[in-house]
Regions:
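Phosphate/dinucleotide-binding and metal-coordinating scaffold of catalytic cores
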Residues: 1-325, 329-437
């Protein structure tokens, strides 16, 4: 094996209230197929350390420090050429991954290079970049490899992040952009994007209209949503030609227009799952687990648990069968304490079942069967499993939400794609168990 080791400095941006700027918290390294995160000792020893992920927290401070110092914990090191799960979830998928690999000149499965390529525009307040060559191999990195019997002799070369490259998780084609007047620019001159531009697909040219309508449906119920609007192709300066007229522009809640970064993580990261495990352990169990996290750890638990339950019911009513663990998130406004992130990526996937073969959307169809069958007794049991109190009050609020959706959504669906109209109207008219007394 080559004795060259490559490494990146790992930073978290501080909240503006704490003076802003960024704090180094550790290093990411690659030695052959070994990919590891090594945290700085001052970060480990700081009881007020900024939160990278709930997956790195233990039951108490001593447990947390033990995790952060661990030599072999899978949350810190892997030997198969992949990042530990938290960092895997930062990487794009599908076309977005292929595009980033082309920009970097690396293979799509080279996870070290992909993360390094997009190091200045990652999800949340995280940033990574190469260490200046003259600094040599960081002691904390060299020490771990030496204790494992690995002969680390020389630093390998790592290029700086690709200008304007971004890592946006998900499979739908999207670009990171900034808004300049009425224009949306992907060529950002190195600035992190504050807007995500999402494109439709040839299979679903109405995807943008579908998602925008679902944002409107959710917003009409008072749910806390990311801000989204439909723009024309002429309003966006994209790096490549696209055959679509409409683009969905979504304001990021982790990267603000003034350059502020707010840390966030997907629930998939918080629970320690790899991207391929985004459907978790099943709809009801995952919802109960997320509810429990929000109730016990949020700095606004009453507001967030009510919001979470309302989103669950809204997703059932609108047929959003792709609300997996990567489409729910936590934000850390103070850099430490989580709260439920705004709603994002609401899509009526059930509308795509029409005209598809029975083998297409198999996972989503199975989820849809569970959603449509979920009645009030099962919902009550889920809330109880999550450990929430005042269950009758929660159920009363959710019953009222169903009535409001039945009253208000038909007007909002008037200009929606026809398949979306038919799908949601059928659900409101008795197609899901929650519309029954």
């Amino acid at each position: 094996m080559s004795t060259a080791i490559r490494y990146l400095r790992l930073y978290l941006h501080r909240p503006a209230a704490q003076g802003g700027g960024r704090r180094g918290i550790g290093y990411l390294s690659q030695y052959g197929d070994i990919l590891r995160v090594s945290f700085d000792e001052d970060y480990i020893a700081d009881p007020q350390r900024p939160t990278l992920s709930l997956s790195y927290r233990g039951a108490n401070e001593a447990d947390t420090q033990q995790i952060l110092r661990s030599a072999r914990d899978a949350r810190l090191v892997r030997t198969d050429g992949r990042w530990p799960a938290y960092f895997q979830n930062l990487l794009p998928e599908g076309h977005n991954r292929d595009r980033l690999a082309r920009e970097r000149g690396c293979a799509p499965d080279d996870e070290f290079e992909l993360l390094a390529a997009a190091g200045h525009d990652l999800m949340g307040a995280l940033e990574v970049e190469p260490v200046p060559a003259q600094e040599g191999v960081p002691d904390v990195v060299r020490y771990w490899h030496t204790t494992q019997g690995l002969d680390v002799l020389e630093p390998g070369f790592v290029e700086y992040p690709v200008e304007d490259a971004a890592s946006l998780p998900g499979v739908v084609t999207k670009f990171s952009a900034v808004q300049d007047g009425r224009r949306y620019l992907v060529k950002r001159r190195g600035a992190a994007g504050s807007v995500i531009l999402k494109l439709p697909t040839t299979a679903h040219p109405d995807l943008v209209a579908n998602e925008f309508t679902c944002y409107q449906l959710a917003g009409s119920l008072g749910l806390h949503c990311a801000q989204a609007r439909i723009i024309t192709r002429a309003e966006a300066e994209l790096p490549e030609a696209v055959p679509f007229d409409d683009i969905l522009a979504v304001q990021r809640f982790d990267h603000l227009a003034d350059g502020t970064r707010v840390h966030m993580e997907e629930f998939n990261q918080a629970l320690g799952y790899a991207p391929r495990q985004k459907y978790g352990k099943g709809l009801l169990q995952d919802w109960a687990t997320m509810l429990r996290v929000v109730d016990r750890l949020s700095d606004q638990p009453v507001q967030d648990t009510r919001e979470f339950l309302a989103r669950m019911v809204a997703f059932i009513l609108m047929g959003n069968t792709d609300a997996h663990l990567k489409n729910w998130a936590l934000v850390y406004p103070d850099g430490h304490t989580p709260r439920l992130a705004p709603l994002y990526d609401p899509v009526c996937v059930a509308a795509f079942f029409e005209g598809a073969t029975e083998h297409q959307y198999a996972v989503n169809r199975a989820i849809d069967r569970s959603m449509r069958a979920l009645g009030w007794d099962a919902l009550q049991a889920l809330i109880k499993t999550a450990g929430l109190l005042r269950i009758p009050r929660h159920l009363a609020l959710l019953r009222d939400l169903v009535r409001r959706a039945q009253a208000d959504w038909p007007a909002l669906l008037a200009d929606a794609p026809s398949t979306l109209q038919r799908t949601v109207q059928a659900r409101l008219a008795g197609g899901v168990a929650l519309t029954h007394p």
